[in-house]
Amino acid sequence: MMNAPDWLRLFPEADYRLSMGLRPGNAGRFWSDWDSEGRLAAERSRWLAESAADYQGCLPEAGDAVREARSWMAGYSQAPEPDWVLLSPDPHEEPHVIAGEVVFPSSWALADKLGQPMSSVHAPVPGLQVQMGAGIRTFLAKIEPDSAWERENWGLAADDELNHHPKRSLPRLGRHSQPKTTWIRLEHQFLTRLPKSGGLLFGIRVTCHRLDLVTQVPEVRARIQRALSTLPEPLARYKGLHECRHLLA
């Protein structure tokens, strides 16, 4: 079951800055089923049945690691709800994407990332490589087998659809956006190292929360306003907020 987001932790009382924001995680909580009615698993199956090639990918050398990853996830759920990406195992080289199943992406496609090193995966995010690239690589190299780490990443969206694959061309936020028609798109992320292959397993869950309801708490509203108003312009454009953040803040 999903815990309510800790909005005060996600939006600290400070100007916006890129941050890893990692903390010790709980594999059982993250990978066990959150949706007791099975709707999330059903939607996942529907998209995969429609076009699996858009959401799944695997390099030839990744077969053993993928089998290990699927077996590991099956220890928590027979139909895992999170998306997942598998990174190469060598701690002495920059990890690159070797496999995954990403049904609910935030405006990116797994096929475009397959085979790429993390520096290339993160390259579209303004400032990330300069500010955090070295720290990310060091952290990934030090992850121990069966350890668990979690973080969140937030964005805003014009709908509460989970599947934001770029091929869908969904409506975007713009100059007429309002809080009641805007959702916080929250990515819950998980990292561990598989014990046999050494591959890095990266899990992603997406939840959507209507902005006007979240900001009913005055302190939360003030912190979100501060984050939006201090978001650097290149990042605001990357997140699709450059035309509307003053309306939403």
Where is each model-derived feature located?
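Extended, well-ordered protein cores
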Residues: 1-249
